[in-house]
Amino acid sequence: MQNFTVSNAAKVLDVSEAQVGRLLSRGEILGSKWGRSWVIDAASVHRYASTRPERGRPYLPERAWAELLDSNVRTMDDAKKLAVLCRRRAVRHGVRVIPGFLDALRKDSRVVLSGVDAGRKFKAMVTLGPPVDLYVHVDDVEKVFKRYVSEDHVTDPNVIIRVVESDVLQQFEHHVPLIVALVDLVAEGDYRSAKEVLNAMK
């Protein structure tokens, strides 16, 4: 697995090293601390690069959710643009959960499932597989992490936890709508599953 230094990541993304530090702290790129230096997962840098805006800023969380839930996506290009604009609707954590706990995590009433789990719920022709993608409200995140998460900010997560501060999750019954699952799959680079979710939306 290829790794970057902070300097490498800054050059790839054409940002300052301080901005790389902020991306690490928000979980938008992944890395591990070795002494006083960071070892950054190159795949997460490239994933971030593929979904960041070329100009302007992504929407703030409240507007991001409003735009996302009111959107009318017809193509994968539309989905990619929406994923860019709405990327800050939640704080992303790539974590490791012991495989034997995954079923319990999926059934936990404090989580709202996204990705392929939501796709399957709404009849998209997707295959269940890692990573599990889900949302958790900020008020519940500490308890969810304590119960299930063995390691946070890992380079090979089997669960993506997206932490939300607003009350938007209250309107969903344990699974996000297909449009949210779609942009999450696009953001993770799972274009094959994303295309199946898009087909199910038509």
Annotate the PLM regions.
Residues 1-23:
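Polyanion-binding surface elements
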Residues 3-4, 26, 30-52:
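Short helix-start
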Residues 20, 29, 40, 134, ...:
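Hydrophobic beta-strand residues in large extracellular and virion-surface proteins
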Residues 45-78:
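A short, Lys/Arg-enriched interface patch at domain edges and termini
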Residues 48, 67-70, 85, 89, ...:
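Residues that form generic nucleotide/phosphate-binding pockets
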Residues 71-93:
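Long, leucine/valine-rich, helix-dominated scaffolding and oligomerization segments
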Residues 95-202:
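Phosphate-handling catalytic interfaces
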